[in-house]
Design a protein with these regions (language model features):
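Structured catalytic-domain cores with a bias toward divalent-metal coordination
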Residues: 1-215
Length: 215
C-alpha cells in the first residue's frame, strides 16, 4: 500500500448499530488533515485508530488514511449510499481526479473526543433520539423497558455534543453500549499535539472497548 497517494476505508456501523456519515481521522497528522479537507463539510471524529488496523498502519507508513463510517450493516440504504458516493466524488474532485462543477463545502464539526452511553438495565430499548441529533446534559436519549413488569428506565445524556452513532431498538443487556456521543470541544481541548490520544476517547475513564469495539 506504500504506493498509494491516499486511502479511504469504507465502513458501516457494527451489527445492530448505525452511524451518521462521518470520518474517523488522526487530526494530529497534517497529511490526514489535508485529506479530510478534501471531503468538504463532513463530521470528523479524531481518533488515531487501533493498532493493527488498516488506517493506522497506512498512516504510519506515510499514506494519509481515513475511515468513512456510514449507516447500518446488512442493509441497502439508498440515501446513505448516495451520501457516501457524493463524499467520495467530492474528494476526487478536490484531488483533481474527477471533474465536476460543484462540491460540498458546508462547515461540519470536528469532535476530538467521544463516549458511549451504556445502559444499566436489561430489557427493550426504545430510543427518543436519532443519529445526528444535538444534545446537552440531562436530555432524554431513550429508555429501556422491562418486558415482565413494564417498568421504564430512562437514559439521559451526561454530555453535550451530537449523537454520531447508536444502537438500533432491540433487546439489550446491562452494560450494552447504546449511544455514541461526539463531545463538544472546548478551546483547551483543541490544543492537541502529535501523539496525543487523550482526546480520542480511548482514555479519560472510558473503557478500552468503548471505541475500538464499534469502529
Amino acid at each position: 500500500m506504500r504506493h498509494c497517494d491516499a486511502l479511504v476505508d469504507l465502513h458501516t456501523g457494527s451489527f445492530h448499530r448505525t452511524n451518521i456519515p462521518q470520518l474517523r481521522a488522526d487530526m494530529t497528522n497534517e497529511q490526514v488533515i489535508q485529506l479530510v479537507h478534501g471531503f468538504g463539510g463532513m463530521i470528523v471524529l479524531h481518533n488515531p485508530g487501533a493498532r493493527g488496523s488498516l488506517r493506522r498502519a497506512a498512516a504510519e507508513a506515510g499514506v494519509p488514511t481515513v475511515t468513512l463510517e456510514a449507516g447500518e450493516p446488512m442493509r441497502i440504504q439508498a440515501d446513505v449510499v448516495e451520501d457516501g458516493v457524493e463524499r467520495i466524488l467530492t474528494l476526487m474532485t478536490n484531488m483533481g481526479i474527477y471533474k465536476r462543477s460543484y462540491y460540498w463545502t458546508d462547515v461540519a464539526p470536528v469532535y476530538l473526543n467521544s463516549r458511549w452511553v451504556r445502559t444499566d438495565q436489561g430489557g427493550l430499548l426504545i430510543s427518543d433520539v436519532e443519529v445526528g441529533d444535538k444534545i446537552k446534559p440531562g436530555d432524554l436519549l431513550g429508555k429501556v423497558v422491562d418486558p415482565i413488569n413494564n417498568l421504564e428506565f430512562p437514559m439521559h445524556s451526561p454530555f453535550e455534543g451530537q449523537v454520531i452513532g447508536m444502537a438500533l431498538n432491540q433487546v439489550v443487556m446491562p452494560g450494552y453500549a447504546v449511544y455514541h456521543i461526539g463531545i463538544a470541544a472546548t478551546e483547551k481541548s483543541l490544543e492537541i499535539g502529535p501523539g496525543d490520544s487523550s482526546a480520542s476517547g480511548e482514555n479519560g475513564g472510558a473503557q478500552p472497548s468503548d471505541l475500538r469495539e464499534f469502529d
